[in-house]
Amino acid sequence: VRQLVWREDVLSEGSPCTEALDSSYRARICAVIVTYNIREAIHRCFDSIQNQVGHVVIVDNGSDEFTRRELNRLAASDSVTTILNERNEGIARAFNQAVQWARGEGFQWILTLDHDSEATPGMVDKLVQAYVTLQRQGIQNVGVVGANPFDQNTQLFIRGYHLREGGGMPLEEGDVMSSGSLIQSRVFDVIGFFNEDLFVYYVDVDFCLRVGRGGFRVFVCPEAVLLHKEGSKERRKFFWRHAYYDHRGKHAWYYLTRNTIYMMKKHDLSPSYTYPMVRRICKDHVKILLYDKERFSVLWFSLKGLIDAFRGRFGPLNSVNTTTLRDG
């Protein structure tokens, strides 16, 4: 991963993803934000996106009263709809609830967001312009265009794209992160909705793989920058090197381990796709042993996830406290 510092002034006016657009298209875009115990911090995500889209749907997964109070304030606006779940239904189920509402209201595009993400100014314009640019090139089967996520914890672009990579043109990818993904509504008619068996983690990868198999294509727009906080990362020293350890919690590791196996079994992925997944989870487990104070509990839950994956047990883990869960 290349260490790249994001600066808004790097973006040039003449790139393919920054051309002027008729603002009327915004009325056809519905943004979806999934929340869980975010409290007043929801305003960072909401304020960054509310003027870039026609409507915002917020799905809350059983948050505390402080978060619900903030959501009730936002719901006073005619351009905001809230869906309040009594418990944590997982990110896949929450996305599906909002997508079904938005499709019922006739929205043409769905923009999915995590509550700890912030859209940079003009991000949605750049995503839509990417669609327009690709259509002008004769590419009509664009299903998803994703933003370029910048991790505010590590100060790295998560996918390693330079802002000007590809001359500012949209780049084709196998998958993109769910937060910051602009999805054509008609895609759901062909491939169905987000996979609720996964509950959390790899929901975006599974969706994008099904998008590709449904005859659509997935792109990323490097200049559409999304500010994101990926977990609770801590910079640690290991001999002469430095590494980042993400304190996800034991329940998160259950889902990560289980869903990694699920992805490899379900999608029959090529070695070039599975190798990075296996390599990443192996490295992460080494970091658990080195840095996590609850290492044995975390490893036990990870083992439970592995066992459940091979037994075919999916969906939510019973009586799980999902406070630390985030989709990745």
Regions found by a protein language model. Name each.
Residues 166-183, 248:
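A recurrent flexible, glycine/aromatic-enriched loop bordering the glycosyltransferase active site
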Residues 187, 191-192, 197-227:
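A short, conserved alpha-helix in the catalytic core of glycosyltransferases
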Residues 60-69, 87, 117-118:
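A conserved acidic beta->alpha catalytic loop
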Residues 107-116:
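Short beta-strand-to-loop acidic/aromatic patch adjacent to the donor-nucleotide binding site
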Residues 122-157:
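Conserved donor NDP-sugar-binding/catalytic core segment of glycosyltransferases
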Residues 85-104:
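Glycine-rich, basic loop-to-helix element that forms the pyrophosphate-binding segment
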Residues 36-51:
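Short, well-formed alpha-helical segments that are part of the catalytic scaffolds
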Residues 265-328:
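Non-catalytic, C-terminal membrane-associated alpha-helical segments of glycosyltransferases
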